[in-house]
Amino acid sequence: MNVVETSSEMNSNVEKASTPKQENNKRFERKSRPSSRQKVVKDEFEEKVVTIRRVTKVTKGGRHFRFAAVVVVGNKKGLVGMGTGKANEVPEAIKKAIKEAKKNLVSVTLRNTTVPHEVLGTFGAGKILIKPAKVGTGIIAGGPARAVIELSGISDVYAKSLGSNNAINMIRATFEGLSSMQTLKRVQELRYGKTFDKQKVALVEKTAETKNFEKKPPKSTTKKMASKKIEKEDVIAEPMIKNEAENSAE
């Protein structure tokens, strides 16, 4: 009897016939290694674009338009940076600014959620006054200074601009103010050395007090003393003059 093969059986036979070739090909296939470029590393820094301006360059051929971006970068743990970038397109300018900002990072001293003390930061005509605030106050600041304070990790602070409204000057003034802040421990180390001792501090303060006490009295006290001496001399001289007058009369 003639046996008629179905289509499914024919396909299975074809697959079985092709399996040895596939096995040989698998042996000589090159396995791809995981490259370091493909690994996506999470960046801990956050970016904020402060300003984007269109700038022009006039040449003989005409005007060339470009874009300038100012970006602030920070990890909200005490590291902040600022950068500027120029390019023919906005995304390229922002990328350049971010790259420059990560190179110019500044460490900021924090005291819980605020700054350790009041400070006035200046750069050119820009002036920024920064004051500590209680927990729950929030960031009371505006303009470019707010972006720097937020990304530095400060959550309770007062900030006021007292000078120029130029974005770059304001940002650099805030950087100057935040970077100049110091903790109490650091101030004590600068005054009394790294080996800070309370007894040593007490001795230094006592010696300062004694030196101030040994100094000459102020001019007002010296004048009073001189006037009292003159009065005493007058009191002593009056009876002597009377006695001399009586003797001369006799």
From Swiss-Prot:
Gene Ontology MF terms in the entry: rRNA binding; structural constituent of ribosome
Highest taxon listed in the record's lineage: Bacteria
Residue ranges of every copy of the S5 DRBM domain listed in the record: 45-108
CC annotations in GO: small ribosomal subunit
Disulfide bonds, paired cysteine numbers: none
Chain positions covered by the region annotation Disordered: 1-40
Keywords, comma-separated and alphabetical: Ribonucleoprotein, Ribosomal protein, RNA-binding, rRNA-binding
Domain description: The N-terminal domain interacts with the head of the 30S subunit; the C-terminal domain interacts with the body and contacts protein S4. The interaction surface between S4 and S5 is involved in control of translational fidelity.
Function (record text): With S4 and S12 plays an important role in translational accuracy. Located at the back of the 30S subunit body where it stabilizes the conformation of the head with respect to the body.
Family membership: Belongs to the universal ribosomal protein uS5 family.
Protein name: Small ribosomal subunit protein uS5
